[in-house]
């Protein structure tokens, strides 16, 4: 399953992004997924909850859910 998610800022940390994308319900769940190595950013396992995501980044969770980060420019 692939979808896009638009964070409200120019960048967003991985932990709150997973909550925004409704992959997890809490920061604790996000922490577990990230630290257990179930999250990839642009094809690389990411274990830092604070990893900054930017426009075009692709987040893959548990080799099942793929989300592309889309940042819309301010007008």
Model-identified regions with their sequence ranges:
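A positively charged, amphipathic N-terminal helix/segment that binds anionic biomolecules
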Residues: 2-4, 55-75
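Short, contiguous acidic and Ser/Thr-rich linear segments
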Residues: 4-10
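Exposed, low-complexity/repetitive linear segments and helix-based recognition motifs
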Residues: 10-12, 63
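A basic, amphipathic helix-loop patch mediating RNA/tRNA/ribosome contacts
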Residues: 12-55
